């Protein structure tokens, strides 16, 4: 098996067999299953609805739910890695073909990926921001009054106190910056804000 873009980890042995099972689905069945998957990828909190849709798909297409869950788990391997690494539709298609999915189905999935990319990217950014959410920020200016380096005496510095939410608790993070570092930091924050406004 060739190298994958979505992960460096070894791929579970079941994946190859699951891709062969997917290849046996008709175009209509694969399209319906892909639809269910993208509903889940764009609204990952709706787990119960996702499982209900899988059960319905299994019943409609006379497929056992156990094997179907394994197939879906293998199918999610690429999009989950692609979200973390920001892969293109072309890389998603290549990874599916490397795993053994037929070219026709890999192209279909990558086209769906391209259509849903903005929504998925927005969700991924939201998840990243929720991991370390900035709750509060305080700053103080100071002037260096004594230093072993003569040129540093009288230079202005800035102390930042960031209150970051990690899970259910908050943590204080302290940073000391020189004035040029602070302006550079401010510039980066402006760029982040502009990027975030593009997504909202």
UniProtKB/Swiss-Prot annotation:
A GO BP annotation: tumor necrosis factor-mediated signaling pathway
One term of GO molecular function: NF-kappaB binding
Keywords recorded for this protein, A-Z: Cytoplasmic vesicle, Transcription, Transcription regulation, Ubl conjugation pathway
Coiled coil stretches, renumbered: none
Residue ranges constituting the COMM domain according to the UniProt record: 133-200
CDD domains, alphabetized: Commd7
Location in the cell: Cytoplasmic vesicle
GO cellular component, one term: cytoplasmic vesicle
Major localization listed first in the record, in broad terms: cytoplasm
Assembly: Component of the commander complex consisting of the CCC subcomplex and the retriever subcomplex. Component of the CCC (COMMD/CCDC22/CCDC93) subcomplex consisting of COMMD1, COMMD2, COMMD3, COMMD4, COMMD5, COMMD6, COMMD7, COMMD8, COMMD9, COMMD10, CCDC22 and CCDC93; within the complex forms a heterodimer with COMMD9. Interacts with RELA. Interacts with CCDC22, CCDC93, SCNN1B, CUL7.
Family, similarity comment: Belongs to the COMM domain-containing protein 7 family.
Function, in words: Scaffold protein in the commander complex that is essential for endosomal recycling of transmembrane cargos; the commander complex is composed of the CCC subcomplex and the retriever subcomplex. May modulate activity of cullin-RING E3 ubiquitin ligase (CRL) complexes. Associates with the NF-kappa-B complex and suppresses its transcriptional activity.
Protein name as catalogued: COMM domain-containing protein 7
């Amino acid at each position: 098996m060739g190298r994958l873009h979505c992960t460096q980890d070894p791929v579970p042995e079941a994946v190859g067999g699951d891709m062969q099972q997917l290849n046996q689905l008709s175009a209509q069945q694969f399209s319906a299953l892909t639809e269910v998957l993208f509903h889940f990828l764009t609204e990952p909190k709706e787990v119960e609805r996702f499982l209900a849709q899988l059960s319905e798909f299994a019943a409609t297409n006379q497929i056992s739910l156990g094997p179907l869950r394994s197939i879906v788990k293998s199918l999610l391997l690429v999009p989950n890695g692609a979200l973390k690494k920001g892969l293109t539709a072309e890389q998603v298609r290549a990874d599916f073909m490397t795993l053994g999915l037929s070219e026709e189905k890999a192209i279909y999935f990558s086209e769906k990926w391209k259509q849903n990319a903005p929504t998925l990217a927005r969700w991924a950014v939201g998840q990243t921001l929720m991991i370390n959410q900035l709750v509060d920020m305080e700053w103080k200016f100071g002037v260096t009054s004594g230093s072993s380096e003569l040129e540093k005496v009288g230079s202005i510095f800035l102390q930042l106190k960031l209150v970051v939410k990690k899970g259910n608790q908050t943590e204080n993070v302290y940073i000391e910056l020189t004035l040029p570092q602070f302006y550079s930091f401010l510039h980066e924050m402006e760029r982040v804000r502009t990027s975030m406004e593009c997504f909202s």
